[in-house]
UniProtKB/Swiss-Prot annotation:
This is Ribosomal large subunit pseudouridine synthase B. Gene3D superfamilies: Pseudouridine synthase (3.30.2350.10), RNA-binding S4 domain (3.10.290.10). The keyword rRNA processing applies. Responsible for synthesis of pseudouridine from uracil-2605 in 23S ribosomal RNA. CDD domains: PseudoU_synth_RluB (cd02556), S4 (cd00165). Residues 1-76 are annotated as: Disordered. The active site is at 183 (nucleophile). GO terms for molecular function: 23S rRNA pseudouridine(2605) synthase activity; RNA binding. It catalyses: uridine(2605) in 23S rRNA = pseudouridine(2605) in 23S rRNA. Residues 14-32 have a biased composition (Basic and acidic residues). Residues 76-148 form the S4 RNA-binding domain. It comes from Haemophilus influenzae (strain ATCC 51907 / DSM 11121 / KW20 / Rd). Keywords: Isomerase, RNA-binding, rRNA processing. PROSITE patterns: PSI_RSU, S4.
Length: 357
């Protein structure tokens, strides 16, 4: 039998494995196409929604305005003006402001307030109006005072004990500001000034103004102990040390030393020695910067410093020189002798005792 003219073409034979591979590759192609399409569609919708709804787009960052571009507050800091007016050091006045004792135009002042002294603004401390008219022309005055033991470095004492301000000359329109403090059992040089800014700078640790003390200690002192005190000892308020220690005399376990500090922390000299088991039995401040306790000045006596020494202190802390003084040159040349000062101090002490009785 002859084969028919039309012969069916033979279909190629595929194995099951090859079919699976073919189907898998096709499926992957479809998936890749569909994934690309979905991403393009999503992006199109997102851009369309964002163009219609502005709240979905992230706001642009505002340009940073630097402090230098902002207008500065007019006037000077309140504590600086009041310090120059002789109402205390800047730190003392900052404490007053924080306690709500200072008001400006009837409103309680806050730290950072500024005032213009030429605007006639009314400033009160504890309800009393402060005269600011003389703050620009106040002459810087400095007193050297020999503080005796038993006096407090405060303006008033509720127990009625003597204070270092009791014997100072009276002032009108300003007041004396103590440059630092000495505890009740410490005697020696204490400076007072009418310039609050000068007092603040002289006291600030960053100025590193030297304070020298003559100290009598009770106990056995050795070289290792002195080396530790020079290097530094950890106290409860931080590391402290003596810049210089010089032996000046003594017998046995009672010895005298001159020690120098670069700051004035509370009872720092005593605490440094006590950290080594040594007791301080006598402490006298003999120098502040280059200002030495004047020989012949009795305990409880004071001496106003001349313009040269005032300007030394001002230059020491970066303040402009003073050009005026209230110290009478002729009167200064006729200064009373130490014996006269001692008699005056003794009379004052006797009168004070009778008054308290």
């Amino acid at each position: 039998m002859k084969p028919s003219q039309k012969q069916t073409q033979r279909q190629p034979h595929f194995s099951k494995d090859s079919a699976k591979k073919r189907d898998f590759s096709a499926k992957n192609d479809r998936r890749s196409v569909s994934r690309t399409a979905r991403i393009e569609t999503a992006n199109t919708k997102k851009s369309a929604v964002n163009s219609d709804n502005k709240f979905l787009s992230k706001p642009k960052a505002k340009p940073v305005v630097r402090a230098s571009n902002q207008p500065k507050a007019e006037g000077e800091k309140l504590q600086k003006v009041l310090a120059r007016a002789g109402q205390g050091s800047r730190r003392e006045i900052e404490t007053m402001i924080a306690a709500g004792r200072v008001s400006v135009e009837g409103k309680i002042a806050t730290l950072g307030d500024r005032i213009d002294v030429h605007s006639g603004v009314k400033v009160r401390i504890d309800g009393q109006i402060i005269n600011l008219s003389h703050t620009q022309k106040e002459i810087c005055r400095v007193l050297m005072y020999y503080k005796p033991e038993g006096e407090l470095c405060t303006r008033s004492d509720p127990e009625g004990r003597a204070t270092v301000f009791d014997r100072l000359p009276r002032l009108t329109g300003s007041r004396w500001i103590a440059v630092g403090r000495l505890d009740i059992n410490t005697s020696g040089l204490l400076l007072f000034t009418t310039d609050g800014e000068l007092a603040n700078r002289l006291m600030h640790p960053s100025r590193e103004v030297e304070r020298e003390y003559s100290v009598r200690v009770f106990g056995q002192v050795d070289d290792a102990m002195l080396a530790r005190l020079r290097k530094g000892v950890q106290l409860e308020d931080g590391l402290a040390n003596f810049k210089e220690i010089k032996f000046t005399g003594g017998v046995g376990i009672n010895q005298w030393y001159d020690v120098t500090l670069m700051e004035g922390r509370n009872r720092e000299v005593r605490r440094l020695w006590e950290s080594q088991g040594i007791q301080v039995s006598r402490l006298i401040r003999i120098r502040y910067g280059n200002i030495k306790l004047m020989k012949g000045l009795p305990r409880g006596g004071w001496e106003e410093m001349d313009l040269e020494n005032v300007n030394y202190l001002r230059e020491l802390v970066g303040l402009p020189a003073e050009t005026e003084t209230k110290l009478d040159v002729k009167q200064a040349s006729r200064r009373p002798k130490s014996g006269q000062i001692r008699k005056a101090v003794k009379r004052y002490s006797e009168m004070n005792k009778r008054y308290k009785k």
